Amino acid sequence: MAGLAGPAKPSLALNPQEDSQFEKALTQIQGRTKKPQQKKKEKLNRGVVYLGHLPSTLSESHIYNYCAQFGDISRFRLSRSKRTGNSKGYAFVEFESEDVAKIVAETMDNYLFGERLLSCKFMPRKKVHKDLFSQRNALFHRPSFPAVKRYNRKRGHLQMLKMEYRFKKKEKLLRKKLAAKGIDYSFPSLVLPKPKNIAVAHRDSEGNQVLPDQKEGLSGEPRRKEKMMKEDISNNIPKKRKRSRRKKSSVDSQGPTPVCTPTFLERRKSQVMEVGGDKDDEIILKLPVPPVKEDTQKTPTSASPGGKRPRKRKSKQ
């Protein structure tokens, strides 16, 4: 039994002349016993679908699970902003079958999804770029802008000196290049000049200051003209009228008749009434002087409009 163990030896015919026939019969028997070969799978053409007008709240998992209901998905990419990482509102889905992709494009176009009408279109092979799905699984990292951070960082005194030295060196090279090409162009220095002492700068500013002439005013005109201009302006401004607190004259046409005293008569003599505007047309009226009595006459007084009685004056004795 130990001699029978091992790999199977090739079968040989008992009659060497019938060896060829024996091999043919053996191959036929082996062909019958073998399992039937599986049919080769047909290669399916893949189809890409463009999805637009997507809500910004949807993520990759939501869209992938929704589109997987129609068929197998080979690749998927949701476009995102490189600066913020937010969704741009469109995506690309690649199905394993082109027929499935066309069916999805027909059924999902103008479909109301999240208060928006989806734009779903089938993309032919010519329009599909080879790098369309290159960054489909890349994780988003917020950009750091290292160059901007380096430029805006706080520098010490030694670093500032090094920076000024580099700027001066670049400025010299630039001026040499312009001079070599025959370009006469002057531009300010890249490094600001160092500020001088405050006291020295103040003196220089006072020395270079142009003060107005003593004979001239602040406006540049002579002082006499300036004074006349101020007077003209003040005269043109209307002045407020002051309320006169002078007592009204004792003579009133509507009031009670005054007492005829010597002083009253002298005052009446001196009054002059003007009839016209010219001096030649003036008429002077002189009233006759009545006889003066020692006792003053008592004149009857009319009742005042307010209802108050006038005070009685005591007669002089």
Swiss-Prot record:
Q: Which CDD domains match?
A: RRM_NIFK_like (cd12307)
Q: Where is this region: Disordered?
A: 203-317
The covalent link annotated as Glycyl lysine isopeptide (Lys-Gly) (interchain with G-Cter in SUMO2) occurs at K40, K181, K194, K293
Q: How is it modified after translation?
A: Phosphorylated. Citrullinated by PADI4.
Distribution of this protein across tissues and organs: Expressed in brain, heart, hind limb muscles, intestine, liver, skin and spleen.
- Span of domain RRM: 47-125
Which part of the chain holds the cross-link Glycyl lysine isopeptide (Lys-Gly) (interchain with G-Cter in SUMO1)?
Answer: K293
N-acetylalanine: residues bearing it: A2
Q: Which GO terms describe its cellular component?
A: condensed nuclear chromosome; cytoplasm; nucleolus; nucleoplasm
The Omega-N-methylarginine modification is found at R116
List every position bearing Citrulline.
R203
Q: Gene3D superfamilies recorded for this chain?
A: 3.30.70.330
Q: What is this protein called?
A: MKI67 FHA domain-interacting nucleolar phosphoprotein
